[in-house]
UniProtKB/Swiss-Prot annotation:
Entry keyword set: FAD, Flavoprotein, Monooxygenase, Oxidoreductase
Family membership noted in the UniProt record: Belongs to the 3-hydroxybenzoate 6-hydroxylase family.
The protein, known as: Monooxygenase 2
Binding partners and assembly: Monomer.
Pfam families with a match to the protein in the record: FAD_binding_3
GO molecular function, one term: monooxygenase activity
Gene3D superfamilies in the record: FAD/NAD(P)-binding domain
Keyword Electron transport in record: no
Domain of life assignment: Eukaryota
InterPro entries per record: FAD-bd, FAD/NAD-bd_sf, MOase
Cofactor(s) required, per the database record: FAD
EC code(s) of this entry: 1.14.13.-
GO annotation, cellular component aspect: plasma membrane
Originating species: Arabidopsis thaliana (Mouse-ear cress)
Amino acid sequence: MEEEGSPDIIIVGAGISGLSTAVGLHRLGIRSMVLESSETLRATGFAFTTWFNAWKAMEALGVSQHIRSLHDRLEGWVVGTISAGTPPTEMLFPESEEYESRCVQRKLLLEALAGELPEETIRFSSKVVHIELSGCYKKVHLSDGTILKTKVLVGCDGVYSVVGKWLGFKNPATTARLAIRGLTHFPEGHGFGKRFFQFYGDGVRSGFIPCDHNTVYWFLTHTSTDIDEETNSEILKEFVLNKIKDLPENIKNVVETTDLDSMVMSQLKYRPPWELLWSNITKDNVCVAGDALHPMTPDIGQGGCSAMEDGVILARCLGEAIKAKSLKGETEENEEEGYKRIEEGLKKYAGERKWRSIDLITTAYTVGFIQQSRGKWMNMFRDRFLSSYLSRMLLKKSHFDCGSLVP
């Protein structure tokens, strides 16, 4: 059944990129509807590290101060090997804004973004199953039989995006690595200070990052075939503890203290960068953003950060194209003109995001390969020469300013 009064802009997916786009449009006075397949906001992965580019995006969206108030600023990181014997190295971050970094809980960020939107912007339990052409419009079919008609369709629906599939994207490639993530709460304080601890070697990379005085986010990526995505949480915890057995006791205690329902494992996936060279990021009045556009391995910490970049830039390009607070003022006579403006706006967005996406995907995959490679010579080369270079590379890729919502 086709609904009356369908919105002019439909965003599929209430994740970071979807809500960032919706908030950006709302700041410009443009109404949108966000379709989310689950019953509530989802925060898969627990937390992620935010760098300079993420804070620029949050400032543009108007949520930066609130998020800062909930999370401690990191003062530096400690990098070492996963095995005993080699002392770790420490790097302190300068106090300038270019080095601002915090470990942000996804749930708190999503709630902050959702809180900026008018009521009923997000429509939960709304799974998209089919997209149909209808002149200058697209008809979006939901699993409950509802049909929504829209002038702009934005796919922010993750790595297996329905919108991305409509555009011609293939499913993401699967790596040989798995990631185990957890969030640990310490009622009396964790005692870690405000540093990002990272350890790697022998096919393993792990990190322990304080979000605030009481909460630590941790992860471990590996190439083991001993476990898979069906492995239960108790075995996962034992596996992680075995991999980090040579690390200091306070580090191991983070994993030991983690509740079993506060752990998750997933296989790492990415978009082959060459696919972005010939695939359509946008077509007609449809585009993709976030993981639907550029799924990447987590090795440079840019998945969530770049998703916010997408949201700001997409909202700005659409705002320029629409040139009004609403599309409702268009008559049938100039509807085609409005369609062309939107099409050009989305092409501009695609042009801005293509090479940035290719760069991030390629860098993340390469850094992950180097950090988790096995072998005596690779280990020696990495430990002696590459650790500081890789750390600088991570910071370099974060030095990107998406700009404001208004050009």
